[in-house]
Amino acid sequence: TDMFGLHQSMTDDYAPNQVASDYMGVSETLMIFTPIRFYWENKKEILKNCLFVKDGPLSLRATLAKLSAPIRRFFDYAKSKGIDVAMIGQEKSGQFFDHLQLIGNSAPVGSCFIPDNKYIQEKIKHNNTTAVYGADTNYGAKLFIKINDYHKMVINIPTGHRGEFVTSPSQTNLINFKNIIASLPKILSNKFEGALLPIELANKIASLSTYPSAKTLELFADAKKGT
């Protein structure tokens, strides 16, 4: 069953690019929660020693947001059971990343900034609305972090509650905040500015230019040239 309604924007002979993007977003989310579910059902204690890293925000747009509420409930439930599941999502593009470029250079090294709803709407989204940003779509709070002059980043950390991350932003509301911040310097990559090694390695594996698939495409292209 297409619970997200992806088929509604499709016709018999056409599907917009957004369908593929939405499908990928759901797939990535389900994939990162697969090991979490496995350990939760078999050995919860292992989750205390794990950090799950997602390439992109902890957010699901439009109809995909149906998943955000149960995800928030899971994080809250796990915390109530004494299991603080550590997860981050790193944003490398978009309005929050663009804003980081404006404020990052003047921010002190070792600083962390959690914007509230007013700041997000006025300074980043440039809206006049008082609506709570991401209350239905996000399952993580946005943070601007400057570890050093080379590593400045926008990351998301779950809170387990709807909208709390912008109406009353606080480090205490961020699940496993201290352990996450302590772990970040250990997984930095110096290959790219603001890069995290797990994401860099994942993107490297997915790159066609790195693995045999690139050679396959090259052979296919050469064969076509000869015909």
Question: What does each model-found stretch correspond to?
Answer:
Residues 2-227:
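Long, contiguous domain-sized segments
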